[in-house]
Amino acid sequence: GVSSHQIESIDRGFSFLKEDAPLDMRMGQAEQAVTAGDIVNLASKKELYEIFTKLGEESHARAISDAIVRARRIKALMTTGELAGIIEKEYHLGKNVPDFITAKDDKRVFQALRIAVNNELENLKEAMPKAIELLALGGRLVVISFHSLEERIVKLAFLDFKKRGMGEIITKKPLIPGLAELKVNRRAKSAKLRAFEKNI
């Protein structure tokens, strides 16, 4: 998954708070060809809508997709600041939307693009069974998810492992960060930890 180091690296383009960053978002810049900029500038309105809806769970996906398509007809969107500006200025123009609401829209759109660029959900689905196979007897598979779609994949995988008699789910409910953790690491706010112990 994405790391804090990658988020803080301005040349990676993961954060809408880094205004001059290129729209990249590739975790493996050497291996991957398609960037977030490619998706934003080349995907159809319908494709953008589906990405923002399915991967970002963005309720304003249609309006934001419309705004992006209108803007790129005039000029290709090259930076994170330009994309955030479309969301903030074009979509919210004249609607007196509070900054914290705008920031949530930014976050969901950027998150959806990052997931799409890196094929994160499919990679997680493929990694879960491979990880459990590599574990020794008594080994534990511990997964921290930051997104509801990721968490669902982990939950269903663990239930499948248990059904197949491979072991036991240690965390009946996901563990979430406490106040002490959140004070020093705000990015842990949406984190959920699940663990499975292999017994065969």
Describe each PLM feature range.
Residues G1-I200:
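S-adenosyl-L-methionine-dependent methyltransferase catalytic core, i.e., the SAM/SAH-binding region
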